[in-house]
């Protein structure tokens, strides 16, 4: 409940031009991206060894946040103790983010936001989306030197890309909305077929592929030859196996089949 409280407080004060992809549907992401007009040169950021980079400075930030939000003192002290005293028969572990920790996604996202706001000169026009260690901004962000000294102390190091076809969590972002990377969906479909597991995940893949199909030429014009071929094969596989579809997306692909 405390982690849900922290998340609720974060969303309570988050400006609408910032987006956290947690507990949100794809339609919400799509509408937000359309408002953000992701066109021209955008900024993508990824991190080197993100979980291993969550050092003592990030823990200090988390503890300060919990104190500010009024969480129980014993809970905060227990969290600090666990973070500083994990070990094995070989010795103590360095402070980092371990799998299975409480609210890993939320704290990773906040660390990502903290780094972004300290590293870049944020104005009032950018739309920026965050999810764990993923970040994408609707404009080319300018680096500021104001906090350079502190940022150099962090193990957290960003790999920054300035791109005209921005992506976020496997989705292409454009002024017309979102569409999933076709090669990514096709590869997952092929793996599911090999494992004889297509029936359990085809609905999800069909929903993802539908976003590109709905955009039509607006998506096609942004795809290269490899992406177009992958998108075609995705639709073909879904239609050939549409008897496996269980959700409302079945009607969408039935209409496509009639048009073909």
From Swiss-Prot:
Key words, A-Z: ATP-binding, Helicase, Hydrolase, Multifunctional enzyme, Nucleotide-binding, Nucleotidyltransferase, RNA-directed RNA polymerase, Transferase, Viral RNA replication
GO biological process: DNA-templated transcription; viral RNA genome replication
Catalytic activity: RNA(n) + a ribonucleoside 5'-triphosphate = RNA(n+1) + diphosphate; ATP + H2O = ADP + phosphate + H(+)
Name recorded for this polypeptide: RNA replication protein
E.C. code: 2.7.7.48, 3.6.4.13
GO molecular function terms attached to this record: ATP binding; ATP hydrolysis activity; RNA binding; RNA helicase activity; RNA-directed RNA polymerase activity
Record-annotated RdRp catalytic domain positions: 40-147
Task of the protein: RNA replication. The central part of this protein possibly functions as an ATP-binding helicase.
Protein family (similarity comment): Belongs to the potexviruses/carlaviruses RNA replication protein family.
């Amino acid at each position: 409940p405390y982690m849900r409280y922290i998340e609720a407080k974060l969303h309570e004060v988050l400006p609408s031009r910032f987006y956290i992809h947690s507990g949100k549907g794809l339609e919400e992401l799509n509408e937000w991206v359309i408002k953000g007009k992701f066109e021209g040169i955008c900024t993508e950021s990824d991190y080197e060894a993100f979980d291993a980079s969550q050092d003592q400075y990030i823990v200090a930030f988390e503890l300060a946040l919990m104190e500010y939000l009024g969480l129980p003192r014993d809970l905060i002290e227990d969290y600090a103790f666990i973070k500083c005293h994990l070990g094995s028969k070989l010795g103590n572990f360095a402070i980092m983010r371990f799998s299975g920790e409480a609210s890993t996604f939320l704290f990773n996202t906040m660390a990502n936001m903290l780094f972004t706001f300290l590293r870049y000169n944020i104005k009032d026009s950018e739309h920026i989306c965050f999810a764990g260690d993923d970040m994408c901004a609707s404009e080319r962000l300018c680096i500021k030197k104001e906090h350079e000294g502190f940022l150099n102390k962090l193990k957290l190091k960003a790999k920054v890309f300035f791109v005209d076809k921005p992506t976020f969590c496997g989705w292409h972002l454009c002024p017309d909305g979102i569409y999933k990377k076709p090669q990514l969906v096709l590869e997952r479909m092929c793996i599911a077929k090999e494992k004889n597991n297509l029936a359990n995940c085809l609905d999800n893949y069909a929903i993802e592929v539908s976003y590109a199909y709905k955009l039509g030429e607006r998506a096609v014009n942004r795809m290269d030859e490899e992406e177009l071929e992958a998108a075609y094969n995705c639709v073909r596989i879904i239609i050939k196996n549409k008897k496996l579809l269980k959700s409302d997306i079945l009607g969408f692909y039935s209409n496509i089949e009639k048009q073909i």
